[in-house]
Design a protein with these regions (language model features):
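C-terminal motif of bacterial Sec signal peptides marking the signal peptidase cleavage site
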Residues: 14-17
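Positively charged n-region of N-terminal signal peptides that target proteins for export
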Residues: 1-8
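Soluble sensory domains of the PAS superfamily and closely related sensory modules
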Residues: 152-153
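A gly/proline- and charged-residue-enriched helix-loop-helix capping module
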Residues: 131-149
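N-terminal secretory/targeting leader peptides
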Residues: 19-130, 158-360
Length: 360
């Protein structure tokens, strides 16, 4: 009996030892060995950043996210990575912005949560410029990039990259060969002031429709026209519901790579540099691939039987003359005239040129 009790006491002593400091030290030592010589277990613990965007897994936004993830894992030696949530899988666009603001999400690819980006997208019309000039101005060290970074900081966001700009083109089920044809359109609008003002001037009717419901609205003839980039027309399948495409160059669309400022501040200097390097790599990678992506989108659209039109210079000028003042007024009211002029100047519009475009 005494031998049995002795065995029980010995077993209890061994179990108690598992929670002792010596046992804990042994566990840490084991983790250090698994991590490898010359590094601590803490250093080998992978830090994962959460990234969200609203596009599909076949989109440029998702390709940018994947490029950033791959680069970050490589340059950090596997100590950092990115978890990607496409298709607003963490909630709607507003949910995503709320999550981004409260620190639930670390990175976001999409439009910035600032009213100034709307004005920047309309700069081809407002400043009589083109997307390549704007892209350069939004590059590292560019005047627009500096403004963009300043505006985003007010929302606790850091601009890490600006993805390629694309013109929004007109897609319709009524041929639009000239400005007057637009009067026959029931145009889908996206519900913001600039978009509504522009199309209400040009079209017979307008109707706000969420992009996720646009294909159905076209099928049911609630609307017979919409505008978007070539790649987005393909991504959302909208091109299958239209018969005509008319090229326009009054507005661009572009995504930005943004990071929550507090999350960035929580990283070490090395980690911050790795994240910035990964974002710059993603920006370069997508920019290099963009011409091919747009060409492939147009080929897919025309292969569907969609007919493409280009407006005459007279019609393009007429559209700009008819709409420019309304868009200027919209953003002057929203941002303030001084703020709008600052954006125009950053886009390379000199004061004299600005006055000229205002007169139309």
């Amino acid at each position: 009996m005494k031998k049995r009790w002795a065995a029980v006491l010995l077993l209890l002593a061994l179990l108690a030892g598992c929670g002792s400091p010596a046992a804990q030290n042994k566990t840490v030592l084991g983790a250090w060995r698994e991590a490898g010589p010359g590094s601590t277990a803490a250093e080998k613990t992978q830090l994962v950043l959460r990234l969200t965007h609203s596009s599909s897994e076949q989109s440029a936004a998702n390709d940018a996210a994947q490029a950033m993830k791959t680069r970050l894992e490589a340059i950090s030696g596997g100590t950092m990575s990115i978890e990607i949530f496409a298709n607003d899988s963490l909630g709607s666009l507003n949910d995503a912005w709320n999550s981004f603001g409260n620190g639930t999400v670390d990175l976001r690819i999409g439009t910035a949560d600032i009213p100034q980006q709307g004005a920047i997208m309309w700069l081809p019309l407002l400043a009589d410029t083109d997307k390549d000039t704007l892209q350069a101005a939004c590059g590292q060290g560019g005047a627009l990039r500096s403004l963009f970074e300043e505006y985003s900081l007010e929302k606790n966001s850091l601009v890490l990259g600006v993805l390629p700009m694309q013109y929004r083109v007109l897609a319709s089920n009524i041929p639009v060969e000239n400005k007057e044809n637009m009067r026959q359109l029931t145009m889908r609008t996206i519900g913001n002031g600039g978009d509504n003002a522009y199309w209400q001037i040009l079209c017979g009717k307008t109707k706000d429709v969420n992009v996720q419901k646009l294909a159905l609205a076209l099928q049911q003839k609630e609307v017979n026209a919409c505008d978007n980039t070539l790649t987005n027309l393909v991504e959302y399948g909208t091109y299958k519901q239209v018969r005509y495409l008319t090229k326009l160059a009054d507005r661009v669309y572009f995504d930005t790579i943004l990071m929550n400022r507090q999350r960035m501040d929580s990283l070490t200097e090395s980690q911050q540099q790795w994240v910035r390097d990964a974002a710059a790599y993603a920006e370069r990678t997508i920019s290099e691939a963009q011409p091919g992506r747009e060409k492939a989108a147009l080929e897919k659209i025309t292969a569907q039987g969609v007919q493409v039109y280009e407006l005459s210079e007279a019609d393009q000028s007429g559209i700009r003359s008819a709409t420019r003042d309304a868009i200027r007024q919209e953003y002057a009211q929203r941002l303030g005239q001084e703020e709008l002029e600052k954006i125009l100047q950053a886009a390379g519009a000199q004061t004299g040129d600005t006055e000229k475009t205002q007169e139309g």
